[in-house]
From Swiss-Prot:
Residues 37-54 have a biased composition (Low complexity). Residues 1-78 are annotated as: Disordered. It comes from the Bacteria. The initiation process of transfer DNA synthesis requires the interaction of at least three plasmid-specific components (TraH, TraI, and TraJ) at the transfer origin resulting in the assembly of a specialized nucleoprotein complex - the relaxosome. Keywords: Conjugation, Plasmid. It comes from Escherichia coli. This is Protein TraH.
Length: 130
């Protein structure tokens, strides 16, 4: 009884080997890769030669999302240390912009009463000593 079973296994092996010998198998089933931007634009004039575009320079970030979101004319005209201080809380209404100091517990700057604070130890509080 084992001979017919052995024969069927040999027949399956022969069929599998014949399938392998029938032709080359695909090396990949992945889609063809897209050309890189350099390859895709090969032979075309450089972008600078076709259409000059003015460089956009975003305004420098202050570290305050509120100040960064405001129009330039609503921000402090004279630079203050509060603009970069981690203890400053900036807030705005349609009529006014203010800065509250979490160290001194007072409004340090407002658009109605601008106060140019140039130096303050409060920006270093809470930072680890090195």
């Amino acid at each position: 009884m084992s001979e017919p079973k052995d024969q069927s296994i040999e027949d399956e092996l022969d069929a599998a080997l014949a399938a392998l010998d029938s032709g080359p198998l695909p090396t990949s089933t992945l889609p063809e890769p897209q050309p890189s931007p350099e390859q895709a634009t090969a032979g075309q004039p450089p972008a600078e030669a076709t259409a000059p575009t003015p460089a956009f320079t975003p305004p420098p970030s202050t570290g305050s999302p509120t100040l960064d979101a405001l129009e330039e004319n609503r921000r402090p005209k004279a630079s203050t240390v509060c603009e970069h201080c981690p203890n400053s809380v900036w807030f705005a209404s349609p009529a006014e912009v203010k800065c509250y100091c979490r160290v001194m517990f007072l409004v340090t700057w407002s658009s109605k009463e601008p106060n140019q604070i140039t130096h303050c130890d409060g920006e270093f509080l809470g930072q680890e000593q090195e």
